[in-house]
Amino acid sequence: MVSRRGSETKAIVCVLTDRIRISNQWVSHLSFAGLLGVAGFVFAQQHGLFRNLNNLKLFSGREKDSGDDSFLVPGLQNLGNNCFLNVILQALASCKDFRSFLQWVLEDARGSLAGEQEEQLPLTFALSALLQELGTVGSRRSVSNPRKVMVTLTDYAKNFNLTSQQDAAEALLHLISSLQEEIVVCYRPSQSSNLSDILFSRNLRMLAPSEGLHGLMELKRWHKHLRGPFDGILGSTLMCRTCSSQISLEFQFFHTLPLSPLLHHGGYNIMSGCTLEHCLKKFLNTEKVENYFCYRCWHGAALKYLSVIGAAETEIEKLRSCGGEDQCDCKTSLHLQRMPWSNSYSHILKQLIIARFPKLLCIQVQRASFNMFEEFKLSGHIAFPLVLNLSLFTPSSIGVNIEERIEMSSEYQKPEASKNHGMYRLVTVVEHFGRTGSGHYTVYRSVRVFSQEEEEEDCDEDLSWFSISDSEVCRVSESDVLGAEASLLFYERL
Ligand SMILES: [Zn+2]
Ligand SMILES: [Zn+2]
């Protein structure tokens, strides 16, 4: 696991091991406190925020005892305030689909690109190598170095300073869009398809693929390159309840789902008992849109008005045959500008829907809030499940509201084939301590470990959780993980 940078990493491991061996509990407390700032640390300690500190201490005591279950994942060096990036790198290392996506891109490029991959796809190459390293479970402590990824990322995200404290969710989005930029530039259509058949529009959409199987495969390959595993699609629909029409339906890709917690009155605290399901429901709930003009409702009202005032049959027919599109000229051509009308007749609702379940689902709990004077952080626990069923939050057809859907799904047994559709397993939790814009990030990672005997029999996997604060790694229990005040949650589709 340390072969690529053998001597360098080994040296770091030695230094860290020595430091931990000599450390008593105060040294480990103080090194942690140094990261947070003393004030934040005292606050966190008073409020019991360091459930893991005891584990960290225990861990340093357990150094010499390398028993049968003392396997570990590598930590990551902090190269100066980059804990926000380290947690993202650890999180991505836990996402099997993300690691295999990077490997697939490199593999795919091997056939079509001339020259060294390290030169052509420097960020993909560096990230893939680091994530493989972080994904390797070992029996000894090791610490990996994120420097190469940081250097290559800086070339793309020039305005994103990686050495001053940043938001972890923002770092993830920068990393994804930088990768996208690199991968798209290096994309070459496969030899079997004709380059002239493939046109790219400015917004990175492939237009008019060549016909037949090759064209379809090329399109799939292009989408896979472009979107990666964070490939969810969010639909946004506007409906008019008054005339039961759909005004608009738009789709967009999403990398993360930003969910706001439920708040107590006043909006300074997260409501006790708030769950991730509550937040999802709130996010996907219909909301009333004010001051929006429904053309179909207007046409209905205009038809009644013309009949009442005894207008000519030809005028009524013109209105009736109009599709009620927002571009029509009924208002002016029929002199209806003065018709008494208020848009409050229409009841317009907006709703977001998850139109495609992503392979990897990243949920961003929006804890940053504002009042009149300043930005503040919403702290408090939001319960989240180990297994999430996202299909419960997706209306089967537009207009069916989510509560009805939940009732429906519990009433009727789903067919066997679609049983796992929309089912997700928790793989990583990112937690933030301290104030927004400063403080410290830590991460919980789940790692699947196969013991040798099990591998021979039926490959039963053993899921272990680790708490990681930069270079410090320790094993924790599932309940430690579920107790976290999550900022980011990564779920993998089952
Ligand atoms: Zn309407
Ligand atoms: Zn019209």
From Swiss-Prot:
Which Pfam family would be a valid example here? UCH
- Identify which top EC class this enzyme belongs to: hydrolase
* GO BP annotations listed: protein deubiquitination; proteolysis
* Keyword match Oxidoreductase: no
Q: Which PROSITE patterns match?
A: USP_1, USP_3
- Membrane topology label: Single-pass membrane protein
Location in the cell reads: Membrane
Biological role: Recognizes and hydrolyzes the peptide bond at the C-terminal Gly of ubiquitin. Involved in the processing of poly-ubiquitin precursors as well as that of ubiquitinated proteins.
Tell me what this protein is called: Ubiquitin carboxyl-terminal hydrolase 27
Q: Which organism is it from?
A: Arabidopsis thaliana
